Amino acid sequence: MSRRSATSSGHPKVCACPSGLDPYRLPNHVAVIMDGNGRWAKARGLPRMVGHRAGVEALKRTLRLCSDWGIGALTAYAFSTENWSRPGDEVNFLMTLFERVLQRELESLEREKVRIRFLGDLEGLPSGLQELISEATELTVRNNGIHFNVCTNYGGRRELVLAAQKLAQRAARGDLDPTLIDENSFEAELLTAGEVDPDLLIRTSGERRISNFLLWQLAYAEIHVTDVCWPDFDEVALTKALFDYQSRCRRFGGLDPIAANHLGS
């Protein structure tokens, strides 16, 4: 089954998705909280670091599936501002892992026309990783395939505070009338500026919280929680999430059309 979707260049793209899914009702933007790497490893008697490596493979798999099925954007919560409180050896491992994976996968991302962006306090990352992030961003900025956003050293509250500070600074300089600040001007100062909000949030490992992730952008997202730990998140798990999404009636604060008709009769 094929789906025609517009890439960022405006050209239609023919995509295939699993049988039974409505190709015209897939989310344009999927966000994922990749939880359960440590639990996955512990259940197998393995070090947590093995779980993180397996999590990378799950992310590559998910990106490929989303791209193949015509989903326009994938945003992954890779490392939060709170994750610095983890043991130092684990944090160092993760930073090294990010560097190695980005070095290894950049050519493939470019070949597949993926546009990658890293969202967060990037200046707080190791200098080598910062350089790779700049290289990857510049190399893929004109790509017209799936938008791949990697939230690294990211915190939702911090993002909102920074956006408010930028608007306040503009107002203090006289460049902005405070009475004209609205949702659009606020969104323009967010790290995700220019990206559509997520339609679907997927959280793995059964946890039911959003963990300071995309606090503004997830306002109207549908939320799917699966007990599957992130390293085991595969095509079957993603398909279930999409079926769940398509079973919802998205109301954006309004009434279900059936309920609205009933009230009006």
UniProtKB/Swiss-Prot annotation:
The residues that the entry says bind Mg(2+) are 35, 222
Task: List the active-site residues.
Answer: 35, 83
Per UniProt, substrate binds at 36-40, 48, 52, 80-82, 84, 86, 203, 209-211
What name appears for this protein in its UniProt entry? Isoprenyl transferase
Q: Which UniProt keywords apply?
A: Magnesium, Metal-binding, Transferase
**Gene Ontology terms: biological process:** polyprenol biosynthetic process
Annotated family = Belongs to the UPP synthase family.
Task performed by this protein: Catalyzes the condensation of isopentenyl diphosphate (IPP) with allylic pyrophosphates generating different type of terpenoids.
Name the encoding gene, please: uppS
Matching entries from Gene3D superfamilies are given as: Decaprenyl diphosphate synthase-like
Q: How is the cofactor bound?
A: Binds 2 magnesium ions per subunit.
| GO molecular function annotation | ditrans,polycis-polyprenyl diphosphate synthase [(2E,6E)-farnesyl diphosphate specific] activity; magnesium ion binding
Q: What is its EC number?
A: 2.5.1.-
Self-association state and partner proteins as the record states:
Homodimer.
Cofactors: Mg(2+)
Signal peptide per UniProt: none
